[in-house]
Design a protein with these regions (language model features):
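Peptidyl-prolyl cis-trans isomerase
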Residues: 2-66, 97-580
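Short extracytoplasmic
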Residues: 54-92, 337
């Protein structure tokens, strides 16, 4: 038997370091993955944050988003434009080209625009996108040269002139709203003599202070301050004469649309100027020139669309000479008890302010005298109510009622159960349930004693039309008595009206009416009611302010329905957040 030694088999054993490495490897891998995940999450968070801060939509037009950055860029541009406007106000005020009141008004307008700059900027982006599509559809193109020209226009300060006036307003009889032919002739003769005196060597200042009937400027020798060609406050014909005049050379006599006669003079001219550093200022103030040019391009697109629309309207076409009666929505909505009145006030010591403030004791004899005066006036007017206007203009202690330019005691607002008049005045009137034309006995209030005549209850425009059409009433008289339009005192005279000049519903009514007849009553929601009298028709070419009005109205009437039809969305909450 052979004995062999049993072979020894040695088992392989992993070294201890291998186990540790594997564990470390997985730990490191897990840590790495965690880091990667954290980076990814952070990246996502950053991306979301960036999106929310920059790319989140604040609105859209036909599915095309308007991002926060779009709105910020446009807001920055519009804010810069307002800054430039304010700088110009400050410069002109410092140069004496604006009065303090004018500068304050323009500054207030700039401040108001600043308060709405974000929502207004969003609306401008919306308009630009819609109008760009419309321009493409209409074949309207804008070149770089067009943009350059618009930038030059923005950089240009227009010519301004230091203007002076002497005006003579024709006198009118008490209660009348229009002068007679003799009164107009007398006014013309007065101002023509003034012009002759100036040309003969008499000092302008002396003539202005003694002849001009404009109480606001006569004491300052007729100083109107600085005006530009686009001054909408100055009579158009007179403004044209001022810009045609040489320095210190009086204009001819100009009869204004308001019937007032004027002579003008220009003492100084500041020529049109161009800011050669305009674009440099823009970029120095942090505005991207490329983005600014894109905004200007949008402005030019709108102008070109307007030009295309107004091209036909600016040609000679039938126009209609028109009078208007207008009743505001507030008047239409008045309660049934409302009445229009005029009054004559007799105050103790002729001082309504002191009376109402309690500065005149109730037992002061002047209260008794005021009552005696009121009682005497009441008796006088009961015998002859036609004296009311003259008495109000000469004896009323209400300052606004007195004189040829006063109200004659006619109150602007109706007296009603919800009017703002003191109860001591309104309650006795309403309790009397008066009829039109009725004269009421003296009414005591904290201001004194009032003689009140009820003029009318709220008018029904359809009923007034019936009276006019049947010959029972004259259109111009009704306009003077009832209309709330700007031309009411002139019988509602609107002058010549072209198609496209007024709101479409009004224009349609005017051109549908036969010459010499009234139109249908036109109701404009939230505005009021209109009735027109067509007096004449002529072929005329629109120009000046009439053409400007046509341009604005035509574009609005054409564009607004198209904007309403577009798919426009606005995220008001985001816009409000940006504004806050």
């Amino acid at each position: 038997m052979t004995f062999r030694a049993k072979p020894v088999v040695r088992r392989f054993q992993r070294p201890s370091w291998d186990t540790r490495n594997r564990r470390n490897f997985y730990l490191n891998l897990g840590f790495g993955l965690a880091v990667v995940a954290a980076v990814v999450i952070l990246g996502i968070a950053v991306a979301i944050s960036y999106y929310n801060d920059h790319l989140a939509p604040v609105g859209s037009v036909d599915g095309q988003s308007i991002t926060k950055d779009d709105l910020r860029d446009r807001t920055a541009i519009e804010t810069w434009r307002l800054q430039i406007a304010q700088r110009r106000v400050n410069t002109q005020a410092a140069a004496g080209q604006l009065t303090q009141a004018q500068a304050e008004l323009q500054t207030q307008q700039v401040d108001q625009a600043r308060q709405q700059v974000i929502p207004n900027s969003l609306e401008k982006i919306i308009d630009n996108r819609i109008q760009a599509k419309l321009a493409s559809d209409e074949g309207v193109a804008v070149t770089d040269s067009d943009v350059d020209a618009k930038l030059l226009e923005e950089a240009t300060t227009p010519e301004s002139r230091h203007a002076w006036q002497i005006e003579v307003k024709p006198a009118t009889d008490p209660g009348a709203t229009e002068p007679t032919a003799e009164q107009k002739a007398a006014a013309r003769a007065t101002i023509e003599k003034a012009l002759a005196d100036i040309k003969g060597g008499k000092a302008w200042d002396d003539v202005a202070r003694t002849v001009s009937t404009d109480s606001a400027t006569a004491a300052q020798a007729g100083d109107l301050g600085w005006v530009t060609k686009d001054d909408a406050q100055t009579d158009e014909a007179f403004l044209t004469a001022l810009f045609a005049a040489a320095v210190n050379t009086p204009t001819d006599v100009v009869e204004g649309k308001d019937g007032t006669f004027r002579i003008g003079r220009v003492s100084e001219i500041v020529a049109q100027s161009v800011d050669g550093n305009y674009q440099e200022t823009l970029t120095n103030d942090g505005i991207d020139l490329g983005k600014y040019r894109a905004v200007v391009r949008g402005d030019v697109i709108r102008n070109k669309l307007e030009d295309k629309l107004v091209a036909d309207a600016s040609k000679a076409a039938p126009q209609r000479q028109t009078d208007e009666i207008y009743l505001s929505q507030a008047t239409i909505d008045l309660p049934d008890d409302a009445v229009k009145v005029r009054h004559i006030l007799f105050s103790p010591k002729d001082d309504p302010a002191a009376a109402s403030n309690g500065d005149i004791p109730a037992d002061d004899p002047s209260w008794g005298q005021a009552k005696l005066d009121a009682d005497a006036a009441y008796v006088r007017l009961k015998n002859d109510i036609s004296q009311f206007d003259a008495l109000a203009r000469s004896e009323s202690d209400e300052e606004s009622a007195r004189g040829p330019d006063g109200t004659g005691g006619v109150l602007d607002a109706y007296v009603s159960s919800d009017s703002s008049y003191v109860e001591s005045f309104s309650k006795p009137i309403l309790d009397a349930k008066p009829t039109d034309g009725q004269l009421l006995p003296p009414i005591k209030t904290e201001f004194g004693y009032h003689i009140v005549q009820v003029l009318n209850h709220p008018p029904d425009l359809a009923a007034l039309k019936t009276k006019i059409d049947s010959g029972q009433a004259d259109f111009e008289d009704v306009a003077k008595d009832f209309s709330e339009g700007a031309e009411a005192s002139h019988g509602g005279d609107l002058g010549w009206i072209a198609k496209g000049q007024l709101q479409k519903e009004m224009t349609d009514a005017i051109f549908a009416a036969p010459v010499g007849k009234t139109s249908a009553v036109v109701t404009i929601p939230d505005d009021g009611q209109y009735l027109f009298l067509v007096k004449d028709e002529q072929e005329r070419t629109p120009e000046g302010r009439q053409l400007d009005a046509i341009r604005t109205r035509l574009f609005s009437d054409w564009y607004q329905p198209k904007k309403d039809a577009a798919a426009v969305e606005r995220d008001e909450s985001i816009v409000a957040g940006l504004a806050g």
